[in-house]
């Protein structure tokens, strides 16, 4: 700002493809708000949404750009009033947050060993639990037993018994290793399609998974199809943007846990509104993040 205050923000497009586009979007959007009062976060958010053309019904790049600027503006606001941002949002609900050890298929600890064989999954799970984690998240269908990544052709068709057993045997072994008191989140990264999600979900039920994350492409109708077939909580949100993107999932009851990423759903301004909507529909919230410590 012209008074010397500055804010930090971040676009959550650090993985996958698109970081260069997000950087360019931030630059373009920033030009629109030069000269505005940084404390007017609602006014600025609406300007970014309405005056850019592409934000309405927009996707990850435009909302990542909005998010980065919005987070920075809230940082400025907190510094200006000399209070934590959570105070400006209405106050904190708790002093501690439960955390889970995530993406154990890539390994865990200082010397990460990707999981190919069943014993690799078990070893990584045990490492995390030994550090005090009482919840772990694993994508059991990333690597085949030889260490190769599964192709989309292999994961988006009705699975033969062999591939079902590969996934479920890994899950079963991890459940046996960590016991009944550690929650297991079954991650999928939307690699599988709806039919495969139902196949795997039916088999996964007996292992009492906490939730089934991104079981298929983020699409309300496909999510509803999976949800109706399974009695397992479904989680989505890493790739859903703005309250307009979330509304269909709330309205049809196809999601039980949302995972909005503050760095790409529209920033703190929009994330608060998304979470308020979730509260109306008794949908749980677990903020997603896969970015820097910021």
What residue spans do the PLM features occupy?
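Metal- or metallocofactor-binding catalytic centers and their adjacent structured scaffolds
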Residues: 2-80
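Conserved, mostly hydrophobic/aromatic
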Residues: 4, 29, 69, 82, ...
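Ligand-binding pocket scaffold of soluble enzyme catalytic domains
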Residues: 8, 40, 80, 98, ...
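Glycine-rich beta-alpha junction loops
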Residues: 13, 142, 290-294
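Shared catalytic-loop signature of beta/alpha-barrel
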Residues: 24-27, 202-211, 217-294
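N-terminal amphipathic alpha-helix/helix-capping segment at the start of soluble metabolic enzymes
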Residues: 79, 83-97
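Proline-centered loop/turn at the N-terminus of a beta-strand
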Residues: 84, 98, 183, 233, ...
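Metal-dependent enolase-superfamily TIM-barrel catalytic cores that perform enediolate-based chemistry
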Residues: 96, 101-220, 224-225
